[in-house]
Amino acid sequence: MRVQALSAKGGGALEDIMSLTPIGGPFSDRSGRKVTTATLRELKLSHSPITCITAYDYAAARLVDQAGVEIVLVGDSLAQTMLGYENTLSVTVDEMLHHVKAVRRALKNALLVADMPFGSYHIDTKDAVANATRFVKEGGAEVLKIEGGEKRADLIRHIIDAEIPVAGHIGLTPQSVNVMGGYKVQGKNLGGIEQLMRDALALDHAGVACLFIEGIPREVAGMITAEVSAPTIGIGAGPECDGQVLVFHDVLNLTFGPPAKFVRRYGDAAALISQAVQAFRADVRSHQYPSDEESYHLPKETKAALETVLERKRAMRR
């Protein structure tokens, strides 16, 4: 069930937020069932769409999990949304793990997928498996996402052989932004389509638990989804994928630039936060916060004793 965007009708943003379906209410339809990689395949076979949202901290992850989302992705997009980097290339394994641990503590039902950041699997297979193991042992990740197509197939097999599930990621791969010459839609000509199909089939044969597809024409994404056994999760890849993912901050308008074409805003948390902070500041500056009711008080006996002590001190100074 789609959560409605903030209403423009009477009442403030806070009232609009509070009027949404309560957490754990009707739009949570998993009934507390833990999502696994097997669950994703069941959903694909039953043509039941899979939902995935990024989360990078305990509070956000807990809310997303309680809303019934099947996959929580700790994406390397946290480099931009949480750490203020220009792109995803700068974030480190240790920085990623810091956030993966926080999200792990919040989740009860959703499947935790974590991005392996740029440089953590590019040097050699031994280092890649070692880094992947850290994400599982230290971070509690259940699936690791690796960008790249058929050239990553052997590496993915090695990581899977280490008993670590892997999610593939093809199409527009942000870690390859410098090679691609920017964030450009992929697979717009026959050669590009053929390469995407080879990438998808190679990763499917390697045994990926699911396949993220980013920034490609919907027709191509539909072809891939029909050809592979792995569930496909699209972002900017049209409605034919088995599931969809959006960045938490995009969903809630917590970004500071124009959104991508595929982004749909489902709320305006930026406006709510701005209003709340401005209201707090105004109340403090006008001496309306904190009120007497929001303050702690001494017990009557202690207050009386303190007044006696203070009166004695004042008398001594006279």
Regions picked out by a protein language model, each given a short descriptive name:
Residues 2-8, 12-267, 271-292, 298-300, ...:
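Alpha/beta enzyme core
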